[in-house]
A protein has these predicted regions:
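Hydrophobic faces of well-ordered beta-strands that scaffold small-molecule active sites
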Residues: 56-60, 83-85, 135-139, 179-181, ...
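Polyanionic/metal-chelating signatures
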Residues: 94-115, 122-123, 142-156, 167, ...
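Hydrophobic, small-residue-rich alpha-helical packing segments that form membrane-like cores
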Residues: 88-95, 108-234
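Active-site microenvironment of metallo-dependent hydrolases
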Residues: 1-22, 27, 291-502
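Conserved short loop/turn motifs at secondary-structure junctions
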Residues: 59, 183-189, 214-219, 244-251, ...
């Protein structure tokens, strides 16, 4: 007898082909039947709803969240069953007890424990928490640089470069799916192209990825794309461009030129993919966006405070409104926030992206979806943390028709699984891991807003992680089932396979 069966569902198998009606059966953590399914211990009637592979968040910062919030409600409620963490050059590993890696990340890695030193120990600690969803890891440039040479603004010595390379290789040997950089952030911004290419080349023997938050996403976007392509060519690795955008009103429309460069590289045989979040605002460490000697007033005008340990009362407010309340200029307000104790850990939201660019991005066939959510639940985070995947289905499929439903599901499932080496995931296929999401295509919607960013989405009826019912709903209210069935995923070309909670 099957453990679980979905009956009378519109099956979107993740390949981009049209939906077909049938049943899907689950047994022993795997998909046991597609089309017709026999008797099951638990039946779920999915008439009028779609069953798809669980969504894959290709751009997460959940390294520490798996320890602080192992229930991972903000992802599970969206139908996300797997994430890729360690992005933007910040990763949980390697870790050195003598170095505060949270300092380099501005608190993004908060929650890590002293027992974590490498990927294997990190996976062990996370699995002990019984995580709700699956996690795959990148190893971050900023992290290995901070551990090796601190926050020094200089080129590494040959010995330091070799030490960084050893850290990257060690993580890849233990199953990391690639090497990530965040070249807008310290200390990564102090590196030159050659340094990054040398470290990215460590991924080549593993056929792993180089993912990048590029050096510039605004005025010098096109030059940054050229650099990223050159790094990947030199290193002979697959390039994945994170949260592709052209920030700042003067740069709106440049995503078309940027994507043209990507297409040229693809035609030349280079391996390139991208991801995007479906919002017109970004979010990150506020300190990284300002030169304190010369405050960018135009940028300050469009910034909202998401998390501010120094001034919790500022959270959820725009900088101009804070300035008015305090009787300060914009410049004085920014300096007050950023120079306060723990001011460098302030997370802000910047309204700098054009809606038409979001649509242009989503229309590109190699574009995946990554939330880029920063899981700080104390403040008012960017709503993408809770809403990214339902927003794609509601706004860009149902309302705007930018993507067909089968194509949107492909971008959020099989394309992501294949790119990041998640073995036997990302499709509704017999014998594959049973990561599944049941949703109503007519009502699925992101409910999170900038004013109320922690609202769970609507229209997600059930989520299965590794064969166990992890999320369901009753009377429109989501219910976390506490399954704790998530696994730590190792890259497809790593002989060790997966780390399981079982």
């Amino acid at each position: 007898m099957l453990d679980l069966a979905f009956r009378n569902v519109a099956i979107l198998d993740g390949t981009g082909t049209p939906a077909f009606t049938g049943d899907v059966g689950v047994e022993g953590g795997r998909i046991a039947a597609v089309g017709e399914a026999g008797a099951a211990q638990t039946d779920i009637d999915g008439a009028g709803m779609c069953l798809a592979p669980g969504f894959i968040d290709t751009h997460a910062h959940d390294d520490g969240a798996f320890l602080r919030y192992p229930d991972m409600t903000f992802k599970l409620a969206q139908g996300v069953t797997s994430v890729v963490s360690g992005n933007c050059g910040f990763s949980a590993v390697p870790a050195d007890p003598a170095v505060d890696s949270a300092r380099a990340s501005g608190g993004i890695l908060a929650g890590l424990e002293s027992g974590v030193t490498d990927l294997a120990s990190y996976f062990d600690v996370v699995l002990a928490r019984k995580p709700a969803i699956n996690n795959m890891m990148l190893v971050g440039h900023n992290t290995v640089r901070a551990i090796t040479m601190g926050m020094d603004k200089r080129a590494p010595t040959q010995a330091e470069l070799a030490a960084m390379g050893d850290h990257v290789t060690a993580a890849l040997e233990q199953g990391a799916c690639g090497f990530s950089s965040g070249l807008i952030y310290r200390p990564g911004r102090y590196s030159d192209t050659e340094e990054v290419a040398t470290l990215a080349a460590a991924a080549a023997p593993f056929d792993a990825l180089y993912t990048t938050h590029m050096r510039n996403e605004g005025d010098r976007l096109l030059e940054a794309v050229d650099e990223s392509l050159a790094i990947a060519r030199t290193a002979d690795v697959h390039l994945h461009i994170s949260h592709h955008k052209s920030a700042g009103k003067a740069n709106w429309g440049k995503v078309g030129d940027s994507l043209a460069k990507v297409d040229t590289a693809l035609r030349a045989g280079q391996r390139v993919t991208l991801d995007v979040y479906p919002y017109t605002a970004g979010s990150g460490r506020m300190i990284e966006y300002f030169n304190l000697d010369r405050i960018n007033l135009a940028l300050a005008e469009v910034i909202r405070i998401a998390s501010c340990p120094a001034f919790r009362e500022f959270e959820g407010k725009m900088v101009p409104d804070i300035a008015q309340e305090l009787g300060l200029t914009l410049e004085e307000t920014v300096l007050k926030i950023l120079t306060a104790e723990k001011g460098d850990r302030t997370i802000c939201i910047q309204f700098v992206i054009d809606e038409r660019d979001v649509e242009t991005n989503l229309a590109h066939t190699d574009m995946m979806v990554g939330s880029d959510g920063i899981p700080d639940l104390k403040g008012k985070p960017h709503p993408r943390l809770f809403g990214t995947f339902p927003r794609v289905l509601a706004r860009y499929v149902r309302e705007r028709g930018v993507l067909t439903l089968p194509e949107a599901v492909r971008r959020m499932t099989s394309l992501s699984a294949r790119t990041f080496g998640m073995q036997e995931r990302g499709e509704v296929r017999e014998g594959w891991h049973a990561d599944l999401v049941l949703f109503d295509p007519a009502t699925v919607n992101d409910e999170a807003t900038y004013d109320d960013p922690k609202r769970e989405p609507s229209g997600v009826a059930a989520v299965v992680v590794n064969g166990e019912l992890a999320w369901t709903s009753r009377d429109g209210k989501g219910i976390h089932m506490g399954a704790g069935s998530g696994k730590m995923l190792r890259y497809r070309n790593n002989a060790h396979g997966e780390s399981s909670t079982k």
